[in-house]
Amino acid sequence: MEQNPNPNNLPAELNRTSLYLGLLLVFVTSVLFTSYFFN
């Protein structure tokens, strides 16, 4: 992960990271729910 000396880009990177984590959380939850539902 490259360091960016511009502090103005930090919130955008954190927002993008939280967005990816949110999508990953939804994906894992849906997989667990479907595997539990069809089991």
Swiss-Prot record:
InterPro entries reported for this sequence: PSII_PsbL, PSII_PsbL_sf
Membrane-spanning segments: 18-38
Membrane-topology annotation of the record: Single-pass membrane protein
GO biological process: photosynthesis
Keywords, alphabetical: Membrane, Photosynthesis, Photosystem II, Reaction center, Thylakoid, Transmembrane, Transmembrane helix
GO cellular component, one term: photosystem II reaction center
Similarity field: Belongs to the PsbL family.
Alphabetical list of HAMAP family matching this protein: PSII_PsbL (MF_01317)
Species this protein is from: Prochlorococcus marinus (strain MIT 9303)
Broad class of where this protein is predominantly found: membrane
Name of protein: Photosystem II reaction center protein L
Superkingdom: Bacteria
Localization per record: Cellular thylakoid membrane
Primary role: One of the components of the core complex of photosystem II (PSII). PSII is a light-driven water:plastoquinone oxidoreductase that uses light energy to abstract electrons from H(2)O, generating O(2) and a proton gradient subsequently used for ATP formation. It consists of a core antenna complex that captures photons, and an electron transfer chain that converts photonic excitation into a charge separation. This subunit is found at the monomer-monomer interface and is required for correct PSII assembly and/or dimerization.
